[in-house]
Every structure is written in C-alpha cells, then in structure tokens.
Amino acid sequence: MSTLGLVQRVGFGSLWVCALLTLVATAAAQTDAPPYDELRLESVFPAGGRVGTSVDVEFRTTRADLFAPRGVVIDGPAGLAARDVRLDKNVIRATLDIAPDARPGRRELRLLGDRVGLTNMLYFSVGQLPEVLEDPAKDRQTVAWPCVVNGRIDPDTDADRFEFVARADRPLVLWARAQALDSHGQGKHYGFVDLDLRVLDGSGRVVAEARDTIGLDPLVELRVPTDGTYTAVVEHVLYRGYPQAVYRLLVTDAPVPTSAFPAGARRGEATTVQLVGPLVPPGTTVTLPALSSNLPSVRIGHTATDGDADVPFVLGDGPESLETEPNDSQATAAALALGGTVNARFDRPGDVDWFRLDIAEPGPVEVSTVAHRWLRSPVDTTIEIRDESGKVVAENDDGFPIEYMSIHDIEPPDSRVVFRAEKPGPFFARVYEQTGAAGDRAVYRLSAKTARPDFQLLTYPDGVPIWGPGSTAALVVKILREHDLTDDIELSIEGLPEGWRGSRAMNIAARKDRPASSFYNHFGLRTFLTITAPEGAKPGDLTEFRVVGRCVTGGRTLEHVARPLALYFTSDIGLFRESSVSRAVVAEPKGPWLETTATEVTGAPGETVSVPVRVRGGAADLTSLVLTPNLATAGVACAYNAPLKIDLVDGAGTFPLKITAETPPGDFYFTLSRAWGGDIRVGMPGPCTPLVKLVVKSR
C-alpha cells in the first residue's frame, strides 16, 4: 500500500513541489481501456473554510473505491495546503490548512491519483466569516450569525433547517450558493443543484422566499417583522437529494456584492469598479490591479463578506467605455468605438439602449453582447443594426449556439450580428432586453469590431493522463474559426520540460480546392495532439504545458494560446469549465504501450498504407494486438476505421491503414491506440502512438 504524499501549487505560475514518498509498483500488463470515467471529481464537502483554520474535507469521485489518492493539486492564491490525503471506504478525505493571512477567494482543487492521473477541478472558497457544518442528525440546527453554513441536500426530500435569532431593526441577507460553486449531480441526478430558500417565523409562516435569484441560486434580503427566532429552510426545487448536492448558505448583515459595474476591463489595465448588491452602500468601489489572465473572466470580491460571495468580471482586449445616459433613441445614441467595448445595463423594464458606430471604411462588422456568458447576467439581449435613415440592416437574438465542448450553463441568450457596411458613415446598434430584467444586475457588454478572419482554441482534457512512463496519450483541440478563416492553423504543444515530447499538427481549412466530406471533413473543427512522457517518469509526475496556434492570413500573423477545459458532465454536449492551466500527468500503465517510426504516410482514397508499430512495456510474449486508428472529426466519434488485429513478431508489427473513400484530399493527423470506445465523450486515445501525419492525395 502506498504512503501518501502531497502535491501542492502555491499560486498561478509557480513551481511544483512534489513530496511523494513510496511508489506503488506498476501492475502487470492489462487489457482494459483507460478509465476516463474514474477521473471525475463530483464534489468537495465542505466547499470552503475560514482563514486561520483547518478543515477536514470529503472528496467524492465516480469510482472512489478504485482511486488511489496521491495528493491534492491546488491552484490559486497562496495560503492553502493539503495533508493526510487518504481513501476511506467510498470517499477520499483530506485536511486543508488555511493560513491566517490567506487571501479570501476561490481555489481550484484537483485530486492526483496513481490509477487515473488528475481529476477535473472543483472550487473551494476561503472566507473570513465563522463556518458552520450541517449536522444531518438534527432536524433543526441553531446557528449564530454572521456565518456560512456548509450543507448538502441528501437524501431525496431532504430539507435542511437552520434556526437563528433576528431583530426587526437589523437587515439580513441569506444566500444559498450551489450553482455558484458548480455543484452538480451525475447519472439520474444529472444537472446543476437548484435550491429553494425560505425564511419562516416562529409559527411556520413564510416571511421571505427565493429561487433563481443569482443564476439558480436563491438570495433573500429582508427585515424580519418582529424580534424572534426564525428558520431558514434549504431544499432542492425538485425535492431531490444526493451527496454531491453541496451548498454554502451565507447569513450576514454585511454588504453582499452580486454585480460589478463596469462588468469588465481591458486586459492588463488597472480599473475602478462599483460593486452593487444587498446592503452594499451606494458608491462602493474597488480598485482592481492590472489583470492579465488568459481566460475571458476572473472573479472579484469584497473583503467585508465571505470569500466566495464574489462576482464575475470579464477581460477584453480593446478600449473600454461606459454607457452614457440618456441613450434611448437614435438621436441620443451613445458612442461605440470600432474595436472597443461599452459597459452598459438596462436601468428599468423596457429600457432600450442606442449606440452610434462610425464606420470609416466599407466592410464587414461584428457587434455582440456578453451577458449570460461568463457574467450570468439575467438579461436576454437582441441587437438591431440600423443605418442613418433608421432602416434595419441586420439583427440577431441568440448568436452563440451550443455544441459539444460547451463552456456555458445553457445555450447563451447573448447576441451576435455581422453586417456589411456598404459605405462609410454612422450605423446604430439598438439593444433591448426581452424578459423584463432590469436594475443593477442587468449588465451587459457591447463590443464592435471589424469582422476579420481569426480563431480561438479550446483543449481538453486540462489534465492529460499518460498511461505509464514512456507512453503516449492524446488530447483534442477544438478550433473556433471566425469570419471565414480559410488559412491553415499550425498547432503545437509548448512549454514541456526536457524529456517530455509534444506533437505538432496542421489544422487545415475548408476551401474550394478541398472538397467537403460529410463525416471526415473535420476542417477547422478538431485536431488531436499527443504528449509522450519520459521513460524514466514515475506515476504522479506532472508538468504544465500550453497549446499554441499560429496562422498567417491576409498579411497578418495570428497567435493564440488554447484555453484548457475541465469536464463536469458527459452528455451529447458535455458541460465543461475553463480552467487556469493545462497539465500532463503520469498514471499507472494500462498494459503495453505503443511506438512508431512513422511520422508521415501518404496515399489516396481507397488505398492502404502501412504504419510500423512497436509494442513496449511487458509485451515480449504478445503475438497479436488489436489497434484502432483515431482521427478527430466534426463529431464526437474518432475511430477512423474499425479496430483491427495485427500480428506481432518480437513486439513489432505493421498496421494496414485503409484510407476511406470519403476522406477528402488534405493533411490529417491520426494515432493508433489500443481498442476502446472511439468517442471523445468517453476519453482520449491512449496508450497510443505519437501523432502521425496522413497526406491524402487526389485520386
């Protein structure tokens, strides 16, 4: 049995410190597929703690009974450390020590294990208020506020009741946060935890209640009618209950910010924002330092309240401005600079905002909003573009369709419209809201830019498991091409330390000289990359890396770093979250691993090309092996051909790769892997060969 060590990260961009004591001997060659489903971290309870204290936490994973925990990986500000990580029946337990000077706010926690590598992240909040742990044995539990109650709704029909004393002359805020922590269920409990919050007086009468105030999370602000004892009741809106239904109930009379205005700033520039929310005094501001995160948004908070009562804040790359009122008509339209962003909000129900966009040269223009995306603002925007005469030339309601590798809760109701300015002159964006949402939280960001070809990159998983020292595994890169980008994008894995090997690939674009094919036309959508661990690596070794894309188009050189994704749910669209860093981690071997001397093979549709394969890792007695060629496609399936058994002599063999008739001419990148589901919802290819380039010629 292994002696557990500690893996900790102190702050973003810092070095790793690994104190790993005793290694588990690697198992004999296995034939099972890599257990990607066991990588899923489902909950952390409690999901927060107070500065200067130690907290015993419980981690639940999909298969905790098979999870050999090695440590906890922590991303975020310094001041949080993990110890005594251990398996206890079907849960994993650890103690988190929070330093007295730890900065309040969120941390990302991941489990590191021998069998599966690194899990997805979940949030743990460091706060300043006293913390209370729910006692499930009590029907009612008395709490003294201000405090944060850590609870969970389990089992079905569970209703947690917390009694507290309140006075009529003191305002109160109660906020039950579950979706804010990304609390969610799996299987039959699939989806975010959706809570109902009620406050009852001594006779059981409801004096306040809420649902879906901040996203799905309920918040009530009240003054109780008389001094006395009151009860907060927290339950699931569907009367469900399960151990992963974790929440944090804030009870306070301190300011609770729920929104910031402006709702974003230019990346790399300091700014001052106004915080608004229950009990927040008018004019409360906070000055933010220059923020340089590669992610689209960060979280900001207020030191007077609990650490995870924070608000999202979006980072942009162009000039920022504030909406000026009145701007309720074309004649009073506020300025919107091309290449810039205006921070705005709907002040009252029925409010309509107008913005003037002066176009110097004819050409395509994109105008879009950010509201639900990243901000979870309650507004549903529509954009109309009008010319100087008032004629509508373009409009859009919902401009961001959802698809696999989704990073948002639902299909976003944000708007995006692209129109062509046929001549220089003023154009006007009329922005209105469709649900009646208004007030301090009804914020949005309106951006305008020249609609030039560009791209963004997403990559999954953010923790790539390498199944054994010397072995190779794949990750998938999703390419979001913008405005008819028809140039190829070079993708590369960069930042790996000496001994690790990353691959390169070219993501080719759809053009007239590259005829489309229904299933295998992955032009501009997804591409596999691979990482190979050093042969001298050990289970638990991990390293950071980044995926970079470069493209030359129209005389411009574009370069973007991929945003890594962590998976929460498996489904037709999946639910992913952007995380702060990409890592590769060595896990226990899953039987033989694969090598190839081929870096490129060439053929035409219908032809068969030979790919040399060498099997390593206890494979001396193998006389055959089933392999699958994997190629990232437009969908979730990635098996290019059916699994095929090849003969081995002294660990070497040849795989006959049949180039299908449907494959269009172009450059593709594939791996050969041990047979598995061939579906990126199940996992990634691995153990597999390093990436091989397939050049498909015209017949």
PLM region spans:
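Acidic, Ser/Thr/Pro-rich low-complexity intrinsically disordered segments
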Residues: 35-82, 87-91, 100, 126, ...
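Beta-sandwich strand segments
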Residues: 121-123, 241-244, 438-441, 554-564, ...
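Boundary at the C-terminal end of the N-terminal hydrophobic targeting segment
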Residues: 27-31
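Short proline/glycine- and polar residue-rich coil/turn motifs
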Residues: 85-90, 101, 212-214, 224, ...
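Short beta-strand edge segments in extracellular beta-sheet folds
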Residues: 123-131, 248-254, 289, 312-320, ...
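Predominantly extracellular/luminal regions of secreted and cell-surface proteins
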Residues: 121-145, 306-340
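Ligand-binding face of N-terminal immunoglobulin V-set domains in extracellular IgSF glycoproteins
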Residues: 54-60, 90-119
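Bacterial N-terminal signal peptides
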Residues: 11-25
